[in-house]
Amino acid sequence: MDVKKVVLAYSGGLDTSIILKWLIESYGCEVVAFSADLGQAEELDGLEAKALATGAVKARIVDLREEFVRDFVFPAFRANAIYEGQYLLGTSIARPLIAKAQIRIAEEEDADAVSHGATGKGNDQVRFELTYIALNPAIKIIAPWREWDLKSRSDLVEFARRHGIPIPVTKEKPYSSDRNMLHISYEGGILEDPWLEPDPAMFTLSVAPEEAPDAPEFVEIDFERGNPVAVNGERLSPAQLLTRLNALGGRHGIGRVDLVESRFVGMKSRGVYETPGGTIMRTAHHAVESVTMDRELMFLRDSLVPQYSRLIYNGFWYSPEMRLLQNTMDLAQENVYGTAKLKLYKGNCVVIGRRSDRSLYQPSFATFEEDDVYRQDDATGFIRLHGLRLQIESLVRGKSR
């Protein structure tokens, strides 16, 4: 494959630093190192200088934090997306944005190829490449882990030494991690034993629930059309709001999940996740929905959530079926305005109140006291009609005995 210039999704770790040098050596091409700022904090320090020192002709770090939360996290949370009942899709939802920005930079830099550092066994290779194909079918794709003959950690270290690529002198973590504004994930290494409890020192965004404050903290979150817009009455931008909720949740040990998930490529893998702000946001969203969404609308929407979540997990963010589902999910949120009040305490996020000017909860109908709006004897015919098919089935079954 003839390649003149490649835009590499560059994290600054040993793997993508080696890939940068390998691309130059294997393809004789120029490499532009692209890094997406999704809230990795200090992980971005020194990234540009490191990329240039490794051989990149240019290094670009793009702040995508607001776009990430506004256009990717919020749509997923409007839909109550969750994979296999536990995973809030923190890594999955970030990949299409990184790949989208990578394609944009490739077009700006007149590059004819893109490259990523995802392995041939994981989900990320699919997520990156499906986005590349959807947004620029003509772009060439280089996936080094599926091409090169570097098969082990020792092979990578030897390649780095041979090419003068700095190898971290700090003790290697016995697991891998991936961080953005929504979550941090941990997998591999010692976590591959699903019976082994994670090291408490591993966690970054949250304190252990048993070490959280002994007094609860209360928070109110306002929603408009299913989007959180304010915390305790203060309106915030999407990224600011998620940052605030991360701090609150982390302080109280909220949002830790240890699970085994089904990868798109076929195998199961263990993942440990911290999603403090997202957990609060999801709980509050459910609370406001409970008083503002029609029952049948909610049932229908809920039936679509598993498929919607699988599309995100499997990398089909830019597919026609995702556009259809997103439009449907957003239509279901037209009436979701209101405020949820939560109590945060030692790993627990508990709804203690909800209110809305558009509330479908009407005390005059729901009261257990005497009322003038609901005729209890109407229930007799209601029950008879709904029981008719059961009555017929029982009669037929009795005849067949």
Swiss-Prot record:
Gene3D superfamilies (UniProt xref): Argininosuccinate synthetase, chain A, domain 2, HUPs, Single helix bin
CDD domains in alphabetical order: ASS (cd01999)
UniProt main location, coarse: cytoplasm
Cellular localization per UniProt: Cytoplasm
Oligomer and partners: Homotetramer.
Organism of origin: Syntrophobacter fumaroxidans (strain DSM 10017 / MPOB)
InterPro entries attached to this UniProt entry: Arginosuc_syn_C (IPR048268), Arginosuc_syn_N (IPR048267), Arginosuc_synth (IPR001518), Arginosuc_synth_CS (IPR018223), Arginosuc_synth_type_1_subfam (IPR023434), AS_cat/multimer_dom_body (IPR024074), Rossmann-like_a/b/a_fold (IPR014729)
Assigned EC number: 6.3.4.5
Family: Belongs to the argininosuccinate synthase family. Type 1 subfamily.
Positions annotated to bind L-aspartate: T119, N123, D124
Classification via NCBIfam families: argG, PRK00509.1
Protein name: Argininosuccinate synthase
UniProt catalytic activity: L-citrulline + L-aspartate + ATP = 2-(N(omega)-L-arginino)succinate + AMP + diphosphate + H(+)
Record: residues binding L-citrulline: Y87, S92, N123, R127, S176, S185, E261, Y273
Binding site for ATP: A9, Y10, S11, G12, G13, L14, D15, T16, S17, A36, G117
Keywords: Amino-acid biosynthesis, Arginine biosynthesis, ATP-binding, Cytoplasm, Ligase, Nucleotide-binding
CC annotations in GO: cytoplasm
Pathway as given in its UniProt record: Amino-acid biosynthesis; L-arginine biosynthesis; L-arginine from L-ornithine and carbamoyl phosphate: step 2/3
GO biological process: argininosuccinate metabolic process; L-arginine biosynthetic process; urea cycle
